[in-house]
Design a protein with these regions (language model features):
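N-terminal leader/targeting pre-sequences
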Residues: 1-148
Length: 148
């Protein structure tokens, strides 16, 4: 398939009990299929008190459930989905959408050599930038439901 797979948007769901920079923030994500894989764009606005900070964000395999970061499961990893017992963790097997905050907003893009399979997914925003060796990015702060 080529063309838009999904466009989802709305208020971010809070995954932390304490007040944070994404309380009241909104996001839009769009995933487009192409001949060589897919391209994802994430736009977040309404971020408070975090200008100059970089946050990790990733497509996750499970749903976005307010107050329950674990419900989002792990990162969507094409190797894991394919049943690979030793999956590679990288920006080629996962959708990493790190963004820097400027004037209360951030934008990220990712192009990957695969097309994510449909399901009840989410984009999760993490407390830290993604570690490119481990794929980790700290605590889960907020999420956006992505279903197709």
């Amino acid at each position: 398939p080529r063309g838009p797979l999904v466009r989802a948007g709305g208020s971010l769901s809070d995954l932390q009990a304490a007040a944070g920079p994404f309380d009241g923030a909104h996001a839009v994500v769009q995933i487009v299929a192409s001949a060589g894989g897919s391209h994802t764009v994430l736009r977040v606005r309404g971020i408070h008190g975090a200008d100059g900070q970089t946050f990790g964000a990733h497509l996750h395999a499970g749903p976005c459930v307010a107050g329950d970061g674990a419900a989002a499961l792990g990162h969507y990893n094409t190797d894991v989905i394919a049943g690979d017992p030793t999956p590679e963790i990288s920006e080629d097997t996962e959708v990493w959408l790190d963004f820097a905050v400027d004037d209360g907003a951030g934008t990220a893009t990712a192009s990957v050599p695969f097309i994510p399979l449909p399901g009840d997914r989410s984009v999760v925003i993490h407390a830290l930038a993604t570690d490119h060796h481990t794929g980790l990015a700290g605590a889960r702060l907020a999420c956006l439901p992505v279903q197709w």
